[in-house]
């Protein structure tokens, strides 16, 4: 008999890394941890413990629940009830991959709890229904750095040196109009591919020449962001690149050789000086949901791929 409970863990992820839009994302050492329990009363109970947890729906509009149901419907099963208990260190709603983690947690927990036998391609097809950021999906799944370096190619995984880190912050005086525009032309797309390739090379081999990454972020608050870069340099880590994390509002600063003690000092200093409303420090995570949850051993089971995904999409649309 299958277990009635399963524990699932998924890392945070940051997209638009170095300004590469959806061509590069990196897994981070924060995580969403879900204990999912099967029930037979058709009810969903969600307990969520984590920063900004009040933003997380406690009903079947919850992203984990919707992904969970989509996996069941793919196999022609109906939702019969579940308890979700979540402990997360991923801040919700700040462009740090909380939605990506929720999608993977829902799919992985359903796959393992019900023995659905969904293979990797099917899981990605289902995940793409709920999360359009492909780079984040790949980074959170495999860990490390996910990059797409040429048109028509898939995402490659690169292990990231632990010399690197990320300081992520909500600027105190940044423009409220924060957004990342997708690449709109061949020249712009080529730039994103180049940035992705440069990131993969440098973050895996820190002794190689530092590429030109530059800045890609909000227009407002440039003086404050320059002060952040100066603070990092004073702490012994020049900012290698600064960029809007995903769709914002968080701005990320890619760092190198910043010790945990120095990172805490930087966080305190930025808050004290009024340069940021919130600050987090992260390290790369070189493992992801696949390894953490032993998904590599999940054997694919025969199914009509198109039919199953269409059923899941229909369920998502109905929700």
Residue ranges and their predicted role:
Residues 202-319:
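Glycine-rich, charge-dense phosphate/pyrophosphate-binding loop(s)
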Residues 30, 96-118, 143:
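DPxDG-like acidic metal-binding loop motif
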Residues 62-72, 196, 231, 265-266:
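Short, well-ordered amphipathic alpha-helical segments that serve as non-catalytic structural scaffolds
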Residues 1-94, 112, 116, 286-287, ...:
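ATP-binding N-lobe of GHMP and related small-molecule kinases
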Residues 168-223:
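Active-site rim beta-loop-alpha module in soluble metabolic enzymes
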Residues 48, 81-86, 119-129, 211-214:
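Beta-strand segments within the central parallel beta-sheet cores of soluble alpha/beta enzyme folds
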Residues 120-164, 229-232, 242:
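Alpha/beta catalytic cores of group-transfer enzymes, especially the acyltransferase/condensing modules
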Residues 38, 170-171, 253-257:
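Short beta-strand-to-loop capping motifs
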């Amino acid at each position: 008999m299958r277990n009635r409970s399963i524990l699932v863990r998924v890392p945070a992820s940051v997209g638009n890394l170095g300004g590469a839009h959806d061509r590069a994302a990196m897994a981070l050492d924060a995580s969403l941890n879900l204990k999912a329990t099967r029930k037979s009363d058709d009810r969903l109970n969600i307990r969520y413990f984590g920063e900004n947890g009040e933003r997380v729906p406690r009903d079947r509009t919850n992203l984990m629940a919707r992904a969970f149901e989509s996996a069941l419907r793919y196999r022609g099963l109906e939702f019969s009830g579940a308890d979700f208990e979540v402990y997360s260190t991923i801040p919700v709603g700040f462009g740090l991959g909380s939605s990506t983690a929720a999608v993977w947690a829902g799919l992985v927990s359903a796959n393992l709890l019900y023995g659905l036998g969904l293979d990797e391609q099917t899981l990605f097809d289902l995940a793409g229904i709920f999360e359009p950021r492909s780079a984040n999906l790949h980074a959170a799944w495999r860990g490390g750095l996910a990059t797409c370096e040429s048109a028509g190619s898939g995402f490659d995984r690169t292990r990231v040196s632990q010399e690197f880190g990320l300081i992520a912050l909500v600027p105190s005086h940044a423009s409220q109009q924060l957004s990342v525009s997708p690449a709109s032309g061949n020249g712009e797309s080529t730039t994103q591919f180049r940035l992705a390739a440069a990131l993969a090379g440098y973050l895996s081999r820190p002794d190689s020449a530092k590429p030109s990454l530059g800045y890609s972020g909000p227009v407002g608050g440039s003086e404050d962001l320059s002060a952040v870069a100066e603070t990092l340099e004073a702490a012994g880590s020049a900012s290698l690149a600064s960029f809007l994390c995903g769709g914002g509002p968080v701005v990320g600063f890619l760092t190198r050789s910043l010790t945990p003690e120095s990172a805490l000092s930087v966080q305190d200093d930025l808050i004290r000086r009024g340069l940021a409303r919130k600050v987090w420090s992260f390290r790369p995570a070189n493992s992801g949901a696949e390894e953490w949850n032993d998904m590599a051993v999940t054997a694919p089971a025969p199914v009509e791929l198109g039919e199953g995904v269409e059923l899941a999409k229909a369920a998502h649309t109905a929700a």
